[in-house]
């Protein structure tokens, strides 16, 4: 069985333009949402997801063979191509979800509250390898990210938490990892790495197994419960960070 595990590495406090990068990325997503909701009827007629994405990109990005209909390139100059495509994908998903909810609302004769298209978003950029993310020297607690400094996109050296990096080097060295995603928790920034691995499931009969369930909550961060197959609870732990939740 293939499972995916993830681990967040804290970015140590330093003078790097993380906030500016996050702001321009979210602004790009908001702008694209406004565009795609206007032309959704046209895009929705394209059944193939890849072709729909290509059509959406052609609307906003000019190349030698394509002239964009909207001024995305002017508003967000020199945005790395992979980051632009990530923003496009997020915007398409947002508009598609809104249209689906709107159709369901109309079929119920508007008995509940009408769905709203929210332009403000909490999208987090993915730092694709080689073009947005580069590993530091072997054994060094650092990485290189392409960030927006308010004028241009430049490579910045980022210091990473030593304890987190030691854990990755010890437990995940040699494992296949995905491109890291920026994450913000409790006023701190992290790079979240995901790892794929093959595991062998236990052959213990289901009725004899003990499991750990994790419920992600709103008022508390998480509740972990150890229980038997018949529902008997053996232990429970509430995890709640007192600081402000992002």
Positions of the model-derived regions?
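Nucleic-acid substrate recognition interfaces
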Residues: 1-246
